[in-house]
Structures are given as C-alpha cells and as structure tokens.
Design a protein with these regions (language model features):
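Non-catalytic accessory regions flanking glycosidase/transglycosidase catalytic cores in CAZymes
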Residues: 1-94, 103-141, 153-157, 196-205, ...
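A generic structural signal for ordered alpha-helices
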Residues: 2-4, 11, 73, 168, ...
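Flexible loop/turn segments at secondary-structure boundaries
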Residues: 16-18, 41-42, 142-143, 169-170, ...
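Cell-envelope and extracellular/periplasmic
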Residues: 37-38, 99-100, 165-166, 209, ...
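Surface-exposed, active-site-proximal loop segments in enzymatic domains
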Residues: 66-80, 100-111, 170-176, 215-227, ...
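Noncatalytic carbohydrate-binding groove/subsite architecture in carbohydrate-active enzymes
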Residues: 111-242
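Aromatic/acidic polysaccharide-binding cleft in carbohydrate-active enzymes
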Residues: 206-285
Length: 293
C-alpha cells in the first residue's frame, strides 16, 4: 500500500486559522484527512462544511459523533446522520459511524446502545448505496466490545472496521498489556476478528491514535500521570514506531493521528501568538517523504 494511502490525520475547525491549517496540511503532504462532525451540531453544519471544502482535493473521512440524545432515539440518529451525509456527500463517500462507543461520556452506556444505532445502517445503506460506512469505533484495546459489534445476528453491514487503537497507557508501542499484547499483537487480534466478521467487510482502519504530552493541562486530561504522557521527543519517536509497526503487519489499511493542532497531544501547539511545530510534526512529515522506508 502506498504510504500516502496509509497515513491519515485528524483536523478540526476549532483550533487554528483555517488557512494556516491548509498550509500545514500541504507542508506535511498528507492526503487522507479525518474531520469530526457532531450530531448535536446538525443545525450548524455550515462551519464544518466550509472547513471541509478547503480540502476538497484530499480524501476525507467524516466521523459522525454521537451523544446521549441521539443514542436514546435511534430514529433521531438516522435522520441526523442522513442530513450529515447529504451535506458532505459531494466531498466524500466515507463516513465513520460513532466514536468511542465503549465510553459512556460519548452517550453509549453499553454495546447494545451502539448496536441499536448500527441497525439504522440497513436504511442508510439503502438510501446511500455508494457510501462507504466504517463502524465498531471501539476505543483502546477492548476486544470483547469489538467482537460484539462484528459478530451478531443484526442485519447491518459495514464496509470497514474503525478502531481507536490507543496504546499510550502502556508507553511505547512495543510495551505489552497484560504482559502479552504489544501493538503488533493487538492489531493481529483485531484483524482476525475483522476477517471472521459476519457484519463487516475485511478492512481495518485505525482512526485515532496519539500520545498525550506532559504538563499540558487542560489540553490533555491525564497530564498528571507520567506513565501515560510523554515529552515531545518521545511522542515523535512513538508516532514513527506506531505507523511503521502498523504498516509492516500488512493488516491495516490506514492509520489516522488525532490531531494536527492541539498542545496536549497534537503535532502543532497553538498557544501564544504563533503556531509551533513540535517534533512529532516533523516525524509525521518524514513518514510521507518518498525516501522513508
């Protein structure tokens, strides 16, 4: 897989001047971009759409975010998601359904809540046969939650499995959870689940990963825990290792770093009067250079 097909980056209209973001994206040379669109902003989609239109020559994945109101009313989720697809379908045919579905702060109190939303995908697929839908959207390595979204007797069908495969709590991508599972093994397990799934085509997209930075509160929630936060040079090293490990497995179609501008875990610090490119910015740029192997 060509490296520009593999490497992706999350961007947001909420941090930084849009024109500056365009320039940063161009400097990096990244072609795949992820933009979050919250369901609770469905009446104010114009700013998100105008932002996305700045990148119409890129390959955009829209991540539709859920909240409790939309989880509690699947019909509302269906209508809102349809409106978002209608708004963005001139720019992209790729949509990720939900985000961190195994964390209650995003509205799903259990996996069944999310399965109720995925049931709407039967209708979405009928309405939009040309759209590629990614789902599962489990954060961290919780294979039982992933399993429930990929093996069941529901009727929905996904085009790709999205995984928010953070490993920062272990430190390095080579560190092992439970003494067994480093990043490569986690990917192999998720890929095996995807390959056997009866609800999903055999594609694995890692749609979020980052390493939070030390001493950057309030921009990262866990700055007080050195075990899961790193200095800027270490972040750049782990970023490089993560993308290289994931690509070398041959089991992942793409990986997106979340996100471009954020002082707590991004590639660029926007505090102060100017945008400061951190070591991870240059590490990400090197990934995309033809000389990188």
């Amino acid at each position: 897989l060509p490296i520009k097909e593999f490497v992706g980056l999350g961007i947001s209209p909420e941090h930084g001047n849009p024109n500056a973001i365009v320039e940063l994206v161009e400097e990096l040379g990244v072609k795949r971009l992820l933009i979050r669109v919250p369901t609770w902003q469905v009446e104010q989609l114009d700013p998100y759409l105008q932002f996305a239109e700045l990148f119409q020559h890129h390959r955009i994945l829209i991540n539709v975010l859920q909240d409790r109101q939309h989880v509690a009313e699947p019909e509302r989720w269906l209508n809102t998601t349809s409106r978002i697809i209608n708004s963005f379908s001139a720019l992209t045919n790729e949509f990720q359904l939900g985000n961190a579905i195994n964390r209650s702060k995003w509205g799903c109190q259990n996996t069944q809540d999310y399965l109720n939303l995925l049931d709407c995908n039967v209708e979405l697929k009928r309405q939009y046969p040309q759209i590629q839908f990614a789902g599962s959207s489990v954060i961290d390595f919780e294979p039982l939650s992933t399993l429930r979204t990929l093996f069941n007797f529901h009727q929905y069908q996904l085009d790709a499995c999205s995984a928010l495969l953070y490993v920062n709590r272990r430190g390095s991508p080579y560190s092992k959870q439970f003494g067994l599972f480093d990043l490569e093994k986690k990917i192999r397990i998720l890929a095996a689940l995807v390959s056997l799934s009866n609800r999903c085509d055999h594609k694995l997209w890692i749609t979020e990963v980052n390493w939070p930075l030390l001493n950057t509160k309030p921009y990262t929630p866990n700055s007080g825990h050195p075990r899961s936060t790193v200095d800027e040079d270490t972040q750049a090293q782990y970023l490089t290792e993560y993308f290289e490990i994931a690509q070398q497995t041959g089991l992942v179609d793409r990986v997106y770093w979340w996100q471009l501008i954020n002082p707590g875990y991004g590639l660029v610090d926007h505090r102060g009067d100017e945008l400061r490119k951190m070591p991870s910015f240059y590490a990400f740029k090197r990934l995309l250079e033809p000389s990188h192997s």
